[in-house]
């Protein structure tokens, strides 16, 4: 796969244009040295504060030798952060806090990464209100992950018992017959898991999320457990990532920043997203990986998405990355709908964050262009502009769930009937996702929900287990905006997606807005204005039928693609059509190569 050079050139030009000669600082001069096992939290904080004071925003580089740097909760930077799509438990224990920093590069030097190792539940890196900052050759990991890996040694299917070996990094104890895993400041009983093939590290066919044998257990010998657990799919040698659904912190948190770059850096493990960026402008990922270390035997990386962008604007560039083994998607780009809960006067309403993992952070400001959507039919009704906005249920932004918003134009009389959401169009990004490999992960590959131009090209989607690419939009459950107007998916290779079922996984490419009352919808959610979604010159290697599922879109092109049928797995998906189209118009399917032939009468189904 060709390497994408776009971002390196762009970053270089940005650096030359905005920066003078960089002043270089060496972390070792502040006592920050690798491989000691000692806590480096305060030493790193001193280095950052010194650079801020001495450089006052002028260009600087903080250089760390390659190797492992340990951080501990007891001396962490204690912060109140509200992180989109994460558990809103505070305070956060932060290892490295970059706050209000300008024109700083934190760089690992030498062979390998400068690897920040967490010793307990912590937020490894926070970038808050920064501008023109870069992480280069930096990695994030933890000594004892909250995901506990086990290997199946014996599966007594007849009697309903499985014997498994717990990975040596894990801490565990048995309490009242329950397997309790723990770290220095956390403990729980794993309830769900993801099963991997021992030899390929791919998720086992048709397993999705599995229940676990963590109750009524017996210790056969240290780290070997026998449990009542009936699942014939888990043959000896299978590897299970035992987990919860908790998302306390991402690996890297970026909020209200501008011109942020992650270059040749990696998240090996995080108890939430690998990278979570919210309400930030212009983000570049080049050679950023969420990947296995390869030297410790782990099959998993992050507890949730590899990268996640909530309410960002400008341009998101993600190229030359490797995303593998995560418990959710490689990338998700969206905004956040507020629900209208009260109409105070003709121009003023109350909008509320609705999801329990998305509130407490900046949503928009004066002058922002917005549009309203009816959540039951997902129809955009009209636009408006913000005149004033302030927290309504709290005195401050942090932790607030409601905003009082005054608009330029009068509001409809029925705006507060519980059916309307508000989308902020100012905070919507253009996206370029290219030259990446996504493999062996749970759920889906890539999610995009933005009205701006989105180009997805030259990527490899390899055994993503669910849908490879999802275009969504949901003002009912996740409350993630919005409609896609201009998406091009080209020159990608898709290998055996859809080996398991997850939410929204109706095709290898699934265009799936959440619309409770599709039958009553009179407008189309995605597409329009002569654009829509173009899928061209891709290769689909698949064992099953569904290629594209689409719902409520005006403008869908599937052109010049190659579909190669294989027998790697038995077909199982409920969707037996190549193209299943619900309320879709202006469709073009042409000049494609299907290895088993194409019959439009049998392979295409229009509904509604």
Where are the predicted features?
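Small/polar beta-strand repeat architecture
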Residues: 203-247, 390-431, 439
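Ser/Thr/Gly-rich low-complexity blocks that favor extended beta-strand/coil architectures
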Residues: 142-143, 167-217, 359-397
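Extracellular beta-strand-rich solenoid/capping regions of secreted or surface-exposed proteins
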Residues: 45, 49-54, 70-105, 117-136, ...
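Acidic Gly/Asp/Thr-rich repetitive segments characteristic of extracellular carbohydrate-active
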Residues: 27-63
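Short glycine/acidic-rich loop motifs that flank beta-strands on beta-rich extracellular proteins
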Residues: 118-124, 144-148, 249-251, 271-276, ...
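Solenoid scaffold repeats with emphasis on beta-solenoid/beta-helix
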Residues: 25, 60-62, 96, 104, ...
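Bacterial Sec-dependent signal peptides at the C-terminal "C-region" and cleavage site
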Residues: 16-24
């Amino acid at each position: 796969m060709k390497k994408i050079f776009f971002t390196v050139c762009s970053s270089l030009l940005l650096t030359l244009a905005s920066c003078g000669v960089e002043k270089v600082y060496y972390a070792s001069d502040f006592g920050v040295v690798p491989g000691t096992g000692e806590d480096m939290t305060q030493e790193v904080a001193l280095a950052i504060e010194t650079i801020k004071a001495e450089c006052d925003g002028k260009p600087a580089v903080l250089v760390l030798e390659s190797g492992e740097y340990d951080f501990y909760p007891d001396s962490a930077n204690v912060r109140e952060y509200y992180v989109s799509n994460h558990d809103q438990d505070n305070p956060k224990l932060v290892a490295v806090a970059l706050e209000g920093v300008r024109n700083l590069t934190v760089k690992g030097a030498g062979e390998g990464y400068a690897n920040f190792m967490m010793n307990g539940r912590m937020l490894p890196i926070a970038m808050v209100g920064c501008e023109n900052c870069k992480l280069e050759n930096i990695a994030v990991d933890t000594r004892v992950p909250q995901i506990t890996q086990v290997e199946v040694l014996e599966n007594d299917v007849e009697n309903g018992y499985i014997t498994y070996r717990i990975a040596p990094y894990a801490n565990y104890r048995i309490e009242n017959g329950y397997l309790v895993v723990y770290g220095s400041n956390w403990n729980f009983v794993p309830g769900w898991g993801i099963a991997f093939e021992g030899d390929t590290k791919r998720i086992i066919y048709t397993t999705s999320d599995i229940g676990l044998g963590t109750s009524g257990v017996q210790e056969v010998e240290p780290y070997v457990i026998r449990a009542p657990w009936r699942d014939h799919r888990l043959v000896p040698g299978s590897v299970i990532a035992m987990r919860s659904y908790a998302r306390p912190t991402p690996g890297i948190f970026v909020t209200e920043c501008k011109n942020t770059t992650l270059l040749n850096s990696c998240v090996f493990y995080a108890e939430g997203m690998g990278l979570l960026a919210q309400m930030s402008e212009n983000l570049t990922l080049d050679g950023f990986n969420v990947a296995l270390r390869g030297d410790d035997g782990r099959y998993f990386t992050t507890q949730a998405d590899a990268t996640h962008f909530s309410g960002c604007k400008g341009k998101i560039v993600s190229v030359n990355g490797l995303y593998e083994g995560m418990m959710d998607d490689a990338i998700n780009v969206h905004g956040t709908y507020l629900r209208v809960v009260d109409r105070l006067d003709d121009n003023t309403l109350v909008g509320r964050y609705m999801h329990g993992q998305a509130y407490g952070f900046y949503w928009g400001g004066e002058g922002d262009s917005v549009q309203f959507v009816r959540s039951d039919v997902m129809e955009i009704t009209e636009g408006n502009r913000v005149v004033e906005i302030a927290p309504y249920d709290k005195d401050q932004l942090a932790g607030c769930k409601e905003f009082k918003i005054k608009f330029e134009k009068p509001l409809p009389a029925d705006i507060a009937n519980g059916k309307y959401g508000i989308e902020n169009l100012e905070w919507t990004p253009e996206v370029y996702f290219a030259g990446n490999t996504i493999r062996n992960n749970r759920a889906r590959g890539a999610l995009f929900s933005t009205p701006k131009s989105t180009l997805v090209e030259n990527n490899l989607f390899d055994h993503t287990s669910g849908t490879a690419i999802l275009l969504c939009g949901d003002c009912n459950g996740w409350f993630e905006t919005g409609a896609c107007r201009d998406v091009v998916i080209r020159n990608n290779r898709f290998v055996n997606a859809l080996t398991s079922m997850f939410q929204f996984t109706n095709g290898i490419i699934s265009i799936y807005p959440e619309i409770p009352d599709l039958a009553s919808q009179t407008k189309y959610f995605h597409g329009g204005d002569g654009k829509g979604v173009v899928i061209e010159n891709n290769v689909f290697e698949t064992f099953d039928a569904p290629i594209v599922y689409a719902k409520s879109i005006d403008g869908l092109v599937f052109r010049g693609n190659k579909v190669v049928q294989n027998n790697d797995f038995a077909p199982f998906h409920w969707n037996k059509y190549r193209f299943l189209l619900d309320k879709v118009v202006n469709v073009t399917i042409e000049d494609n190569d299907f290895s088993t032939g194409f019959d439009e009468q049998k392979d295409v189904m229009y509904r509604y």
